[in-house]
Amino acid sequence: MFDWTGKNVVYVGSFSGIGWQMMMQLMQKDIKMMGIMHRMENVEMMKKLQAINPSVKVVFMQMNLMGKMSIDQAMKKMGQMMGHIDVMINGEGVLLDKDVETTMGMNLTGMIHSTMMAMPYMDKTQMGMGGMVVNMSSVYGLEPAHAFAVYAAAMHGILGFTRSMGDKMIYQKTGVMFMAMCPGLTNSEMMMNLRDNVTWHHSESMVEAIESAKRQMPEEAAMQMIHAMEMMKNGSMWIVNMGQLKEVMPTMHWQM
């Protein structure tokens, strides 16, 4: 089981949804420091987070996932402030299929840049002590989604990156493990205005099915994701659907 005592946690994402619920629950652990990284600060939510556990130092760092220089500068400041990073959770996610650049940038390339910029503060051969990176994907990273093809492409990319970084050789050298979370349909801001954010107009059947389907609450999904993290399975992928946790066992189609 993962020991949260004295850990420095970095969360990249908004002040809502599953990722934010994870932060609120992690504040109840005996962590040392919580760093929130997003393009805009929500002062009231930061105060609410701090109030959960006054003994944890909570800080905010402005960062634009669409800008590599912004990511570089912000992550360096956060790493220097913390000294080292133990846990990094990439929880940002947008569903804007008509805007390909933003969908890929916020969901995938920004996540890759932020992870790689954080690695010097996690890698035990550099300034880190080892740790854990958790990347938020989706069940649409495992299956196709004809209504949201660009979003699905980004989610598939997250899993490819996470599994590759979760290689045993990388872990043995860096001490950093990687995991991916694939939530099912969840009550969140992302689920609003689905019809305005489809890839193209031939998507009515899928949108209607999603709109009428049952959804899990962000807090129950967050609880299960933290449980998965505590199992410390490097390179693993987890479906979190309707408050239930299930590990994904990938099929190998090719081997060198």
Swiss-Prot record:
| Entry binding sites for NAD(+) | 10-34
In alphabetical order, the GO MF annotations are:
alcohol dehydrogenase (NAD+) activity; nutrient reservoir activity
The residues the record assigns to binding substrate are 138
Q: Where is the active site?
A: 151
For this UniProt record, the keywords arranged alphabetically read as follows: Oxidoreductase
| Domain of life per record | Eukaryota
Which Pfam families does the record associate with it? adh_short
A cellular-component GO term for this protein = cytoplasm
Q: Does the keyword Oxidoreductase apply?
A: yes
Record's PANTHER family?
15-HYDROXYPROSTAGLANDIN DEHYDROGENASE [NAD(+)], ALCOHOL DEHYDROGENASE-RELATED
| Family note | Belongs to the short-chain dehydrogenases/reductases (SDR) family.
UniProt protein name:
Fat body protein 2
Species per Swiss-Prot/TrEMBL record: Drosophila simulans (Fruit fly)
